[in-house]
């Protein structure tokens, strides 16, 4: 295969600017699938992706395009990427396997927060960026304004940018020409050098075992080759290899410059790490390819199976998901209230949501999640720094000097009409104003420094509602800062409930604790004695609600008669309730925790 006829590219864009639809049209245009096989979002393989209309997993396909200009067949390797801020890691991995990127911009929405961050990722990987203006068939499309925005904010020349409608398939041929003319072929790849293949993704197949998606940088790999993973020196014999078109197509050999998949009967999921380099065991490469910087989770939460008998199944399921999503981290934990569970680290709230939904759908495991938390740094009295991801791990107040929390630089692009609302929201969430610049005549980009914990605490939903859905957010972690943070414990009848302990800012502690207490009061069933629900910081009670006792009518058998008789019965009841309260345990049904934690 001549290298000059190969093009490796990905499609990047903000959410809803039409990446997956454009991928569909490109696949259609190359006649890779028959009309019967085509369906919308063909590259989004998970049901969740189709339902939510978002891309979560990157996906790589090989397309053959016959160019009428020079009468040649070109091999396009298209890698579809997610657009949501939580899945930036997926984008960076797919870009490392390409030479170019199509930057899709919506002709009515223009440049948005995620558009910019994806451009920076592409520039970091030295990719050739081809701007594409999409949705030109919309009545609200303003092509000239969007072209000027791209030129001003990103610095890309848009004079020859393809103007397309991915929905109707208008001008898709312009994109094909731009891919051939502007994206460079992988000429630095050499079939004769020792094998170097970058693993940019992996998934689990019930029959083939763990399957690696690879970009062959140098050399070639055949069925029967003994391959070696350079990070752990484990060796395997290749049992099958090929490409996706999006159908799985088996081949005998993959050569330098190609993007495909390799199966080698790998049973242990942990043998594969994304970003690793595969080489030939008989003729190994001396150096591995530069992989990816390991991304660290931003949000932690405990996941517990509602049915405790499913715990072992849950562990297996999480291992399988981990294979295709190496940004997930997990460790085993137990809770008095919820039993055995796993504490997981996620890239953001959407990532957490998606993993929970995948566990529910693909493995039929219903889960309960504790309140999400970020990583705090605790400066101990002896000067060492302890990193904690849950309130349960916070040491006693006497053992540390201060708590630091992560701050994020949040860039919000918002129409002028909603600027006041957005700035007020940021102030309410402990935001610190940094910058305000014009994006165009009707929109501003405002930059705030906001604690990551606040972004996790319903900030995104509030941002959408206060801007009627028009504001877009992009954030990155900047640094850790000392804050007045406290641990709030919830007591039921004087007993601490570990699953409900949280770390929060002192300023918001009483208000948020009151909400938790009220929620508990709604859901806890009545007992024979009254139950105090208290939120405490150390020994100080900052919020309290009471679940009143069930009252048995002890006077029912007294018809008239002496009042002292009635008083005596009421006194006896009062004494009994007092005794019960001292020795009685509050039994909180498991589904009460499910309700409380799912509402939080």
UniProtKB/Swiss-Prot annotation:
It comes from the Bacteria. It catalyses: GTP + H2O = GDP + phosphate + H(+). Its EC number is 3.6.5.n1. GO terms for molecular function: GTP binding; GTPase activity; ribosome binding; translation elongation factor activity. Keywords: Cell membrane, GTP-binding, Hydrolase, Membrane, Nucleotide-binding, Protein biosynthesis. GTP binds at residues 16-21, 134-137. PROSITE patterns: G_TR_1 (PS00301), G_TR_2 (PS51722). Disulfide bonds: none annotated. The keyword Nucleotidyltransferase does not apply. One of its GO terms (cellular component) is plasma membrane. Gene3D superfamilies: 3.30.70.240, Elongation factor 4, C-terminal domain (3.30.70.2570), Elongation Factor G (Translational Gtpase), domain 3 (3.30.70.870), P-loop containing nucleotide triphosphate hydrolases (3.40.50.300), Translation factors (2.40.30.10). It is found in: Cell membrane. GO terms for biological process: positive regulation of translation. The keyword Hydrolase applies. Its main location: membrane. Residues 4-187 form the tr-type G domain. Required for accurate and efficient protein synthesis under certain stress conditions. May act as a fidelity factor of the translation reaction, by catalyzing a one-codon backward translocation of tRNAs on improperly translocated ribosomes. Back-translocation proceeds from a post-translocation (POST) complex to a pre-translocation (PRE) complex, thus giving elongation factor G a second chance to translocate the tRNAs correctly. Binds to ribosomes in a GTP-dependent manner. Belongs to the TRAFAC class translation factor GTPase superfamily. Classic translation factor GTPase family. LepA subfamily. This is Elongation factor 4. It comes from Malacoplasma penetrans (strain HF-2) (Mycoplasma penetrans).
